[in-house]
Amino acid sequence: MADDDVTAPRDIRAGGCRVLAPGDPDWDGARSVFNLLIDERPAAIALPQDEADVIDAVAVARERGLRVTAQGTGHGAGSLLPLDGIMLVNTSRLTEVGIDAEARRVRVGAGVRWRDVAPRLAELGLAALHGSSPDVGIAGYSLGGGIGWLSRRHGLQCNAVRAVELVTADGRMLRVDADHEPELFWALRGGGGSFGIVTAIEFDVVPVAELAAGALFFPVERTAEVLRAWTDLLPSLPDELTTWVAVIHFPPFDEVPAEVRGRSFAIVMAAFLGPESAARDLLAPVIDLGPELDALATQSPSALGTLAMDPEQPLPYRTVSAVLDRLPPETIDEVARIAADASALTLVQFRHAGGALSRVDAEAGSLAALPGDVVMFGLGLVVGPGAEATVRARLAELASAVAPAFAGDYANLVEEPADASAFFDAATWDRLERVKADWDPDDVVVGTHHVPARARA
């Protein structure tokens, strides 16, 4: 469809969903995403206020020969296919939040971010299985898996989901769960947003009676020493303790705390479901190295949202990630050398997985577990002439250094278009394609890391 087939801002039903076309006053704001290198150019953008608006948006898209894709907060937008001929359904206005503390159950609209929920849960002594940034949208995070500080004890966020509300490709509003359309429910929990436009999800949260969390800061020159101590420690750690090591090059900005401003550190981050004294005993081999800063303390669960020190403002960046069966000792010196290069990389991070993330539950969704015990993530800011090539080269070096331990990929951390079949075993991928064919045979709904409809024999 040509761009001029979608006219100026208009209602697609009386009092209904507003649709933007290229050139409309609010167009650029509605298509903006977290990664400033991504320039999304959909055919049209729908701005639904409620479920009825989403139904209308899908209907109009189909009438005009457009496909549809959902986007709430703009994280992970780089993994979408080109948006030619696609209506972007901007779900950021679907912000309803309901918390049932007694049932330990939360229902959120598709535009809700973790920052809108986590502090309220903490006041109730509860926590969700959110990830490293409070700015990330709950729906997209949950559909793609979801690993965070409590995941070694409680598993993937997608498997804490108890119901999904969505508009299907043929315009029906459904609520699916283990008893209602269980095969579609299975696909949605880990298979992403290719099966319908999700309007809300409902998920379980967990009690947190006591939490110790914080970070141990070492000068970046000690990265190899820190990584060796950390990897030696991992086999002895209980599921209640999650640790990450991150090499971070802090910018020289006034907003950055003076203690770290303009400096580079190897940081051991930890979250423990228990008392600080026990956490310190478990982490003794690392603490005994003598960190420059020790910020481990008893915390509220709300502190988990900022523990990783992720940026909350949009940035221009490229990333690389991988799930590893381990961090091999023979790679540590090379990894430390690459991570220390502040001219190309801002962050190199290794997350301890394992625990509940490695165990397959019979009731799990399409992403049941991770294939390895360590998750690697690297990020470089692309600023200035030649930066793109420099950052990509250094990220490729990092990937090559850990390649001997490569066990698979985790979709939520892959921020470029990829063959989504690589995220699943053959049997799971076959099943996902069949679910897609049952619910969207014309491949109208496009997800990040898209699952296509399997051609029928």
Ranges and model annotations:
Residues M1-A457:
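Soluble FAD-dependent oxygen oxidases
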